Swiss-Prot record:
Residues 67-77, 145-219, 296-320, 375-378 are extracellular. This is Cell death abnormality protein 8. Signal peptide: none annotated. GO terms for cellular component: plasma membrane. Belongs to the XK family. It is found in: Cell membrane. It is a multi-pass membrane protein. GO terms for molecular function: phospholipid scramblase activity. The record marks 21-22 as: Cleavage. The gene is ced-8. The chain crosses the membrane at residues 46-66, 78-98, 124-144, 220-240, 275-295, 321-341, 354-374, 379-399. Acts downstream of ced-9 and caspase ced-3 to promote phosphatidylserine exposure on apoptotic cell surface, possibly by mediating phospholipid scrambling. Phosphatidylserine is a specific marker only present at the surface of apoptotic cells and acts as a specific signal for engulfment. Regulates apoptosis kinetics during embryonic development. Not required for engulfment of germ cell corpses.
Amino acid sequence: MYLKKHESKLLLIPKNEDKEDAGIIAVLTDRVPSVLIVRWFDLFCFGFAMCSYVLDFFSDIGIAIFHFWAGRHLSGALVLTFALIPSVIINIISMVWMLDDEMHWKRRAHPRRTGTFELNQKRFISLGKMITLCIFQMGPLFWYYKALYYGWMFTKNKKDDTDKEKRKFFMKMVEAERDATLLRFFEAFLESAPQLIIQGSIAANYFQNYYISGKYPYWLYFQAASLTLSIISISWSVVVQNRSLRMTRDDKVNIWPHEAVLQFCWRFLTILARIITLVAFVLLFGIYVVFLIFGHLIVTLVHVIFLQALHIEACTHIEKLLLLINAMIHLFTPFNMAEGNTRYRYLVAYTVEFIEMMIIFLLLPTPLDAFPLIEKIRIGVPATFFIGIFIMLIYYKFFHPNRRQDLEAPNVERNEKLVVSELNGIPSAAIEKAEHIEEIEEHSVPTTSESLLEEDECHN
């Protein structure tokens, strides 16, 4: 269990770069499920993610403008810096992926691809529109819109799941969603999470100053709304990242809507408690909180290495980078980046969070005594944390998708035995004829893995 290396489930890492052909990379977790399902909830997830991204980004920009307008230039500069720099990084990555797709679109005239589904379609979006989206910091919306479009085309198609065109729609939707959720995931922890500490500290200071008068400036309400949107954004990004990975795995069961809601509630409550704890550390220690964060990263890195060590063939540098990224994500919320049991990983991570929360609210009470409503905060924050943990336990005990998978496994086994018993009663000549027909179909129709390798837009 300890120091055992696991496969990464955050990134789709190539097995062999020599297999790349016209932009197609065979990746470890790219598998097409045997049963293709796109629910209305999946389409809702795409739309909700687009709305939350836009609201989160522009609310941060609006808060920065409010601060500049009121003459609080330092506060405005901090909010604007932590909003724009991560957004620029994410949109540069998005632009690189778009250009990569554009390059592979131009290479589709390969003789092997003549007459395929791909050549009958125009490019999804023009290069000019791609650049415009990224300039206005809306690059990630392209991938969500693409996933939403192909998901809608899949649901509109009334043909059987074995239909080649319908499977293409599904694979394109999954590919676009994978890119979108990965961008959104990193955007959440590059931009939204640091913004929560910055804006939370600013809001706490001004709340303390205006509490005696009882009259709060209007921008403080907007800042509270912006903080709420950021927490929603982070919580939802973790949920959809998990859901996206499960959708493409034939060995995994996809997340149902009520399971996603439980995951979201658990994440929202624990992240809310964690952010309030970090803001309290900032109010208490100021700039010296950097040393506490550094200490937390060291502790986190140790237990991540012990419990979530990754194995990526011929990619030792990527292993180290992913471990470091995972440790930084743990500053805000535990995240399971590796395959395997999550019990001990979350137990250790949430124990560290609980100890830090108790230190700031119970062992060091004197400096925070002057803060308004501090007694309610000391009770409310741990209560919020434990409610989130309780929802997590309910989720894993009764509603985790693997429980449905375990229940379905015996039925699958019984069906296989039934098929075998039925075949025993079929004449051998009929079986040979069926096998001959199946052999002809295998030579005329591409297999699932071959159709995946024909997919032209997998680039990361």
